[in-house]
Amino acid sequence: MRGNFMSSIEKLGGLKQRLTITVSAEEVDKAYKSRLLKVARTAKIPKFRPGKASPAVVEKLYGKAILQEVGSELIQSSLREAVEEHQLRVAGAPDIKMDKILRGEPFKYVVNFEVYPEITLESLAGETIERTQVEITEEDLDKMLEALRKQYAEWKEVDRPAKADDRVIIDFEGTLDGKPFERGSAKDFQLELGSKRMIAGFEEGIEGMKPGESKALDITFPADYPSEDLAGKAAVFNITLQKVMAPELPVLDEQFAERLGIKEGGLEALRQKVRTNMEKEVHHHMENKLKMAVLDKLIERNPIEVPESLIEAEIDHLQQMTRQQVAMQTHKPDEAKKMELPRDPYREQATKRVKLGLLLAEVVKQHKIKADPEQLRARVEEVAASYQDPEKVISWYYSNKQMLSEIESVVLEDQAVAQLMSELEVEDQAIPYEEAVKQIQQ
């Protein structure tokens, strides 16, 4: 018991605990009198000059409100002291239930809360993970350059039957049992054959058609089609082909390199730039894949219980991220804010994120890891490189403690993962570039 309050702790199972705190009647009266005098010194009351009304008058007008304020202040101070006394690591916001506060009587309240788990880290020694190595061949590079040529192709109208890789302009109307369905029709619709933008059978059915020709296609929607009204249903699409356009690819020469921003070095410099970009893309993905494998091992070796309050807070965060993404995609921020999202689909991801956060914090603490200034600078420069004035952005980050701390957290996480990597056995596995691209697209 402290001088002005008494507290008792009760373990409810798992990470849940309960504090019962009773503030003495003397402390209630002392706090009330102090607050009353403070209010009386500044209160503006009709017929009295500011601060000149007697405490009795102020009490008559504001006594109940003052008592409620005193209750809040006593909870704040006594709860902080009780947490220190019992050496509690409270996770999330506590749930406080208080009795009515009365002058001359002890003030009791109950606090239900969760604590952080006690973590004893298990080393990852003896565990093995695979590190994927990707070799980019000259053939891979040639294919990428060919894809770039297609991106910069000029489309010319041709008078012949449509074939794969052509761009076509069509009118179409879809029907179910002879009746048009919602979003099943379009006019002057542009489509590249072979893009797999449409359901199976649609693009293939247009191949061989001539400009001006009409055709009916019998197509069944996939059973897993997103719209339940259409999934698994047999439809008829009446299609009229308006135009066929074929790609005219640019020549792979110095002029083409200039179009892609290569001012010196011509075609050879372009090949090197494209190779570098390909390497960066697969390296970033494979590093992230390796990192996730390490973190999965960390969770497997260190099963911990996590506070439900932190999981719920993380679900809130993930849902907010979803709403922001929808707002960016739809350009309708007000509608996105009002979106009602179910919580259960986010629970597994939220639980994993909370576990990783707690475990990585323990890795940082146990190994006394500090954010490496050079790595921090490199991260800031990486972010700044995408802006028009990188130096200005770098200066802004270093003058903004909150933004810099966010990047510092990323650097600490990378260093923690590097520490975990040093404990593991790593086996290298080589895969072709095309396989790496498939993994990236999954």
Swiss-Prot record:
Q: Which domain of life is it from?
A: Bacteria
Entry's PANTHER family? TRIGGER FACTOR CHAPERONE AND PEPTIDYL-PROLYL CIS/TRANS ISOMERASE (PTHR30560), TRIGGER FACTOR-LIKE PROTEIN TIG, CHLOROPLASTIC (PTHR30560:SF3)
Q: What does this protein do?
A: Involved in protein export. Acts as a chaperone by maintaining the newly synthesized protein in an open conformation. Functions as a peptidyl-prolyl cis-trans isomerase.
- EC assignment: 5.2.1.8
Family matches, as SUPFAM superfamilies: FKBP-like, Triger factor/SurA peptide-binding domain-like, Trigger factor ribosome-binding domain
> What's the main place this protein lives?
cytoplasm
From the UniProt record, list the reaction(s) this protein catalyses: [protein]-peptidylproline (omega=180) = [protein]-peptidylproline (omega=0)
The alphabetized list of GO BP terms reads: 'de novo' cotranslational protein folding; cell division; chaperone-mediated protein folding; protein transport; protein unfolding
What are the alphabetically sorted keywords of the record? Cell cycle, Cell division, Chaperone, Cytoplasm, Isomerase, Rotamase
Localization terms from the record: Cytoplasm
Q: Which GO terms describe its molecular function?
A: peptidyl-prolyl cis-trans isomerase activity; protein folding chaperone; ribosome binding
Q: Which organism is it from?
A: Coxiella burnetii (strain CbuK_Q154)
- Give the domain section of the comments: Consists of 3 domains; the N-terminus binds the ribosome, the middle domain has PPIase activity, while the C-terminus has intrinsic chaperone activity on its own.
Protein name per its UniProtKB record: Trigger factor
In this record, what's one Pfam family?
Answer: Trigger_N
